[in-house]
């Protein structure tokens, strides 16, 4: 596996976000809609003890899910991380342009409930143990990361979640039409149109989930192609 191929992805994403600031559209992902319901249901069941639900979003991209969480829930506060400075700049602009009016029941704006940070998760997660109620990431785990890097990342997610915290992530799976198409990078990573994707089967999900209890795995289709995803819900033991 050529590490250079993996490392060059950050610049490729930077350029893509700069040239296509709405490349994923404005509507939230179906996975984010599902995650919001799960996070709020945990609060209702008193799994989350604080008044707010503090979640961290990894690989937030251009913020379509970040802003959805903040604008459509009186409970959820989001810390959004992405290694692209263009992505974080875009989220911050949306906060100012569209989400700064105080529309929440507590007098806050949706923008008040979003914190952003430029950060590469290959370097860990820069927060203390037991900080967050939940974690959400849409197709981050299936980016240009090796299996060992994904295992390390999931251990970091486990560390920053509070006991009983929920981790919800999506990955493209080996039934996807792009699997084994394009340039083989190594493991189950393939490059198409400049983007590297790590494809998952359920065995790999189990492999990276040793610290968690897997509560749910279901399949979701996204887009017209479509991308074929697993949506995984884990709970910190």
Predicted regions and their residues:
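A short glycine-rich, Lys/Arg-flanked "PGG" loop and its adjoining helix->strand segment in the class I
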Residues: 151-163
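Surface-exposed loop/turn positions
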Residues: 131, 164-165
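Short conserved AdoMet
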Residues: 145, 162, 210
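Class I (Rossmann-like) S-adenosyl-L-methionine-dependent methyltransferase catalytic domain
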Residues: 1-124, 167-237
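A short acidic, Gly/Pro-enriched loop at the edge of an enzyme's catalytic core
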Residues: 122-135
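A short SAM/SAH-binding and catalytic strip from SAM-dependent methyltransferases
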Residues: 134-148
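Non-membrane alpha-helical structural segments and their capping/turn regions in soluble enzymes
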Residues: 85, 147-151
């Amino acid at each position: 596996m050529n590490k250079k191929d993996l490392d060059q992805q950050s610049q490729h994403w930077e350029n893509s976000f700069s040239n296509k600031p709405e490349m994923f559209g404005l509507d939230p992902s179906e996975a984010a809609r599902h995650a919001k319901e799960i996070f709020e249901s945990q609060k209702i069941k008193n799994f989350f003890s604080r008044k707010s639900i503090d979640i961290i979003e990894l690989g937030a991209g251009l913020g379509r899910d970040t802003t959805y969480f903040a604008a459509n829930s009186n409970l959820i506060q989001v810390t959004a991380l992405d290694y692209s400075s263009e992505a974080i700049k875009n989220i911050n602009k949306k906060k100012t342009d569209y989400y700064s009016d105080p529309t929440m029941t507590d007098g806050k704006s949706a923008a008040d409930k979003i914190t952003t940070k430029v950060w590469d998760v290959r370097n860990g997660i820069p927060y203390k143990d037991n900080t967050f109620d939940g974690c959400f990431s849409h197709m981050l785990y299936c980016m240009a990361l090796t299996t060992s890097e994904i295992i390390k990342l999931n251990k970091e997610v486990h560390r920053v979640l509070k006991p009983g915290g929920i981790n919800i992530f999506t990955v493209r799976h080996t039934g996807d039409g792009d699997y084994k198409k394009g340039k083989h990078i190594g493991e189950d990573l393939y490059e198409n149109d400049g983007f590297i994707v790590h494809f998952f089967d359920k065995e790999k999900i189990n492999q990276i989930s040793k610290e968690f209890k897997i509560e749910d795995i279901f399949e979701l289709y996204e887009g017209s192609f479509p991308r074929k995803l697993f949506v995984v819900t884990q709970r910190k033991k």
